[in-house]
Each structure stands twice: as C-alpha cells, then as structure tokens.
C-alpha cells in the first residue's frame, strides 16, 4: 500500500492543482477504477487538497482511504445544495466502501399533494406511484417543515385524514375539528367550502411550489411592514420568518427535476483540435453520475457531429435502455438521430415497459437549459484539464529527453537526474555573491537552491587579487565540504558558469574532498562546453535538448545570483545612506527614496519638506543629520 501511495500522490497533487474552486462532488477511485469514496465540497480544490496534506494531520481511517486512491473524478454543480443532492444519489447508487457508516443514508423527504377530491398536503419519505403530485426531494427536513407551515399559515388547507367523498359530506359523517375554529381550515368536511374553491387554492399552492413566488413575497413583505407599523411586533417577527423561509425555498436546488423523469444531458466543449463531451445520467429526476469523453482530431468538426459521436459511444456501451428524453447543447444530424433511435428500439426489447421514442431536444430557457449549461461547464473543465495534462506530458518528455541527451553527450554512465549549477556575481570586488541552483529530472527544485555571500574578493580568494577561480573554489568548498554536504545529496553533475579555468577550479575542490562527481563549465559567449580532462571545448548542436537544458540551468543560476546581489546592494545603500539615521528604519528609508529620488535628494530637502513627509520629529532628525 505504501509503495502505491508514494508513486500515486505526486500525480494526484498535480491534478488537484488544476481543479476548480466552485462547488461540486469528487469521487476517489482505487487501482481497479472502482469508486471508493464520494464527497461534496463548497470548494472542490480546497477540499480535495486537504486529503493530500501531512498524513499526521489525517485520521487513521482517512489515511487508509488516501492509501488506496489512484485517481479522482469530479462533477461541477451550480450550488452546494446541488452537490449535496448529487452526493447522496451517488452514494446510494455506487455504495463506495469508505462512505459506509460515515453518511446518514436516509431518503430525502418530499412534499405530497394527494389526488383526493379535497387534496391534503404533507411530508413523506416513501415515494409511491399514485395520483399524488410530488415536489422535491428536499435536503433539509427542517426547511421542508417550515415550507409546510408557511403553506398552512397562508392557505387554509385541511390537515385531517377524513375521506371527503360527496356521499360522506352529504351524510355529515365528519365533524368540524379544531383547525376550523382557529381559522386554519374552512370546513369542507361539512360542506362549508366547495371543491372548486378548494382546488383553486391547491392550484395556488402548486404555483408556489413550482417557484412562482414573486407575488407572494411582495404580499408577505407588505404584511410584515404593516404589522410592524401597527406595533404588532410578534406577528411581524413571525411574518419575517415566513418571508425568509419562502426566500430560501425560492432558491431551492435545480439539480433534481420535480417531474421525476428519466433523462440524459449531453454537451460539448471544443478546443483547436480536441473536444470533450459530457453525459449526465438522470433517473427519476435525480442525477446519478456523469461520464466524459475526449475526442481528438476535431478541427473543423461541427458540434452536432461531435455530439453524435459521444452519444453513440456512450449508448453502445451502456447496458440499460435509453431514457425518455435527451437534452443536448446542439441539434443532432438526422442520420445520427435515426441511428440512436434505432439503437433505442433494440433496447426496448430488453425493456418492454417503455415504448415511447426517445425525444432529443435543445432547450433554450428554464431548468432544462440550466442542466445543459452545467453539463457544458463540466465539459470545459475536463477539456482544460486534458490540455494541461497533455502539455505537462509533452514538457516532461522534453525534459526527460534533455537529461538523457546530456548524459549521452557527456558520455556519462547514467543520465544526470540531479544537476547543480553555480554562478558568481560582484560589482568591482564588492558585494561578492554566488548562487547554486538545482534541477531534478530537468525541472528546477527551488527548495534546494542556495546562495553564498563573501564580503570581498580578498576573502573569497584568500589573497589581494581578483581571482574568480579561487572564489569558485571557496564556494564549492562550502557546498561540498561544509554543513551543506549533510543537508543536501550529491548531484549527478556539477555545472559552473565559465570556461576551462572554472571547470578546473571546481575539479580541484572535488578532488581535495574525495568527491567523484562529473563537472563541466559552460562559457557564455560561444556556448562552449569545457571538461577538466579535455584539451579544448566541444560544442553541442544549437537545437540539441542537452544544450537547451544547460542554458536553462546557467540562466537560472545567473538570475538567482543577480537577484541576490541586487538585494544586498540595495540594503547596503540604505544602511550607508539612510538607515544609520536615528529613527529611520528600512520601511521609512525606502519611502524617502521613493519620494525624493535618491539619498542626495533626501539630503537636499528642506526641513519643512522632510517634516511634512516623515513627521516633525523624524523630519528634523533627518534634516539635522545632513545639516549639523
């Protein structure tokens, strides 16, 4: 298990870095491709990244889970609620190993309007196929109860279980209950409200549950303001709660369709020569999963042709019958439509309960259009992820080839996987620094970068001369003979910026320390490669991957050295010019330089100018420093 984790986690961390930051669900898979865990997230990237932090911060069960992860897949949603619904559906469908006993596998509740003459409205978790109208499912039972209470407070709908047939009402079989006496029911049980009036009220409730809430929101808001103005604060507070509940309901999740239909949704995202198609699988109004397909060599292909290829590939491999409806991002070609209808007719023999032809539609507005757009959003994500991985594979191949080519060009026994490169920087013998950069498998390993500071060339060389060779010896001695020899592993190749003299200086240090690491020098002007044992340089072809890798190393070492040198020089300038003044720190010194242009500009400023900029006390201190 440990070996599997060590090889898998770096690849997964790269995948995690490209994940979106919006809501959705993620599925972890094992080496057999089986989903072993499904989770939801407000921020997919942040949540998934948390699994790959320091194992000591994870629970024992999570560590075991992470040890089995070899791949992951996500589905983007429009809201956290949609992610919650989808997570519940997928856990029920897939029964992932590591979700067992971790999730409450209850069935989400529905709101039911019965098909009786005087319909009742209530909550149920067990959906049945009868004449009732079902709304939901809802993710929060508490919110659903609030909606039911809201309906009861606005509409006098009956709560009793009486069988209100015309015969029972005429026979006065049922008596008025408490709800009638407190104004929550109009008494249809005794014929005090007719069926037509009652059904009209039920129609209003249905419109409310379908999201037509604007008028009701306005009415409740006006009632709340009136109650507050008349000092009926308790009633106003209750109306405010009803208003908040209704607003939450108006924003109910869109992933689950109230009609409970079986349908698939498919959309395409296209690049220059690649495309991605996604298929959402929705059953009984609930989305149970998604699949994506990468298509190559797609330049010039219309979206409808790509959709046809995706759907044919999907349904040919799908073991179940096609759904009643397929929502699309573009209209299919007639030929593709006919072939899919033919495939559907074949599958009907295995599913004789459904005889309707499949309906292929391209919705323009409403919830169906929302589902298509969400599907396209997922397609865009998968395509972007594919293109990033493709680019990384290409870069990795080039980097690997560069390392291999360099090893062959230098006649090394093995490719130099770890390379360290040194560069010196100074200004007329002052602020002398050296940098070391490290590349592993052709890529910078910045955690292994090091910088060295020498106070002067005299110290670097041990003499009064300006001997860059001796300076290089000093730096290499500190890297391979000092404390760093235990901190960092030895490289497979050492590169120094310079010609044969620098290469020989480096070799002298390594011989003295008993280190047998190959060393070369790379001269800037002609890009010549020098080795200590050769009489002269040799040149690599200008297009050689080996030369490109050496140039990248040398340029990175030079950049690192120059940056360090500039920082030291800037700090020294501040220390010698401004930070020696009492009360002037680095922050104020930089601000003064920005305001007056230079140290000379600060010295030439008047007491009034300095006081206005730095304050009276500090301003006068700076002025007296230059004008004692």
From Swiss-Prot:
One of its GO terms (molecular function) is DNA binding. GO terms for biological process: nucleotide-excision repair; SOS response. InterPro entries: GIY-YIG_endonuc, GIY-YIG_endonuc_sf, GIY-YIG_UvrC_Cho, RuvA_2-like, UVR_dom, UVR_dom_sf, UvrABC_protein_C, UvrC. Its main location: cytoplasm. Keywords: Cytoplasm, DNA damage, DNA excision, DNA repair, Excision nuclease, SOS response. The keyword DNA repair applies. The keyword DNA repair applies. GO terms for cellular component: cytoplasm; excinuclease repair complex. SMART domains: GIYc. Residues 21-100 form the GIY-YIG domain. It is found in: Cytoplasm. It holds the Pfam family UvrC_RNaseH. Residues 214-249 form the UVR domain. Disulfide bonds: none annotated. The UvrABC repair system catalyzes the recognition and processing of DNA lesions. UvrC both incises the 5' and 3' sides of the lesion. The N-terminal half is responsible for the 3' incision and the C-terminal half is responsible for the 5' incision. Interacts with UvrB in an incision complex. Belongs to the UvrC family. This is UvrABC system protein C. It comes from Chlorobium luteolum (strain DSM 273 / BCRC 81028 / 2530). The gene is uvrC.
């Amino acid at each position: 298990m440990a070996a599997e984790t060590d090889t898998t986690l770096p690849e997964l961390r790269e995948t995690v870095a490209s994940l979106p930051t919006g809501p959705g669900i993620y599925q972890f898979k094992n080496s057999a491709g089986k989903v072993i865990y499904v989770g939801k997230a407000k921020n997919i990237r942040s949540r998934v990244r948390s699994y790959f932090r320091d194992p000591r911060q994870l629970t024992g069960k999570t560590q075991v889970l992470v040890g089995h992860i070899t791949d992951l897949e996500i589905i983007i949603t429009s809201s956290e609620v949609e992610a919650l619904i989808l997570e519940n559906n997928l856990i029920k469908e897939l029964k992932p190993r590591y979700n067992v006993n971790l999730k409450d596998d209850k069935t989400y509740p529905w709101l039911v309007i019965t098909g009786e003459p005087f319909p009742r409205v209530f909550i149920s978790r067990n959906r049945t196929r009868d004449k009732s109208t079902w709304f939901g499912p809802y993710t929060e039972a508490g919110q659903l109860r609030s909606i039911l209470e809201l309906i009861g407070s606005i509409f006098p709908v009956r709560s009793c279980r009486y069988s209100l047939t015309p015969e029972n009402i005429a026979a006065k079989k049922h008596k008025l209950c408490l709800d009638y006496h407190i104004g929550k029911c109009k008494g249809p049980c005794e014929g005090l409200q007719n069926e037509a009036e009652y059904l009209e009220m039920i129609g209003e409730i249905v419109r409310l549950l379908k999201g037509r809430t604007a008028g009701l929101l306005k009415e409740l808001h006006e009632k709340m303001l009136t109650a507050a103005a008349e000092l009926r604060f308790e009633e106003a507070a209750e109306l405010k709660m009803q208003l908040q509940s209704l607003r939450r309901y108006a924003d109910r999740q869109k992933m689950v369709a109230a009609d409970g239909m079986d349908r698939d949704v498919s959309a395409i995202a296209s690049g220059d020569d690649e495309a991605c198609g996604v298929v959402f699988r929705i059953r009984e109004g609930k989305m149970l999963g998604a699949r994506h397909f990468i298509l190559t060599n797609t330049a010039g292909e219309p979206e409808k042709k790509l959709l046809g290829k995706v759907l044919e590939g999907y349904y040919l491999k799908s073991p179940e019958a096609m759904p009643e409806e397929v929502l699309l991002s573009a209209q299919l070609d007639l030929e593709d439509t006919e072939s899919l209808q033919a495939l559907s007719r074949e599958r009907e023999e295995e599913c004789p309960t459904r005889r309707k032809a499949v309906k292929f539609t391209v919705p323009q507005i409403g919830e169906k259009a929302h589902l298509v757009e969400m599907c396209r959003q997922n397609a865009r994500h998968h395509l972007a992820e594919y293109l990033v991985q493709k680019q990384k594979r290409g870069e990795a191949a080039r980097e690997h080839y560069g390392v291999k080519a360099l090893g062959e060009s230098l006649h090394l026994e093995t490719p130099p996987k770890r390379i360290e490169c040194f560069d010196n920087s100074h200004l007329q013998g002052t602020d002398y620094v050296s940098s070391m950069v490290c590349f592993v498998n052709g890529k910078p390993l910045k955690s292994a970068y090091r910088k060295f500071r020498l106070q002067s060339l005299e110290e670097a060389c041990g003499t009064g001369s300006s001997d860059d060779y001796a300076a290089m010896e000093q730096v290499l001695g500190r890297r391979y003979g000092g404390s760093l020899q235990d901190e960092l592993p030895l490289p497979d190749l050492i590169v120094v910026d310079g010609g044969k003299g620098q290469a020989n200086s480096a070799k002298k240090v390594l011989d003295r320390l008993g280190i047998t690491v190959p060393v070369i020098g790379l001269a800037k002007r002609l890009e010549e490669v020098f080795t200590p044992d050769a009489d002269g340089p040799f040149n690599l072809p200008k297009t050689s991957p080996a030369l490109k890798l050496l140039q990248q190393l040398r340029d990175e070492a030079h950049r690192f050295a120059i940056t360090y040198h500039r920082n030291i020089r800037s700090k020294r300038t501040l220390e010698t010019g401004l930070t020696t003044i009492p009360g002037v720190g680095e922050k104020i010194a930089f601000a003064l330089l920005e305001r007056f242009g230079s140290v000379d500009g600060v010295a030439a400023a008047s007491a009034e100018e300095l006081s206005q900029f730095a304050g009276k006390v500090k301003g006068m201190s700076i002025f007296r420093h230059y004008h004692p």
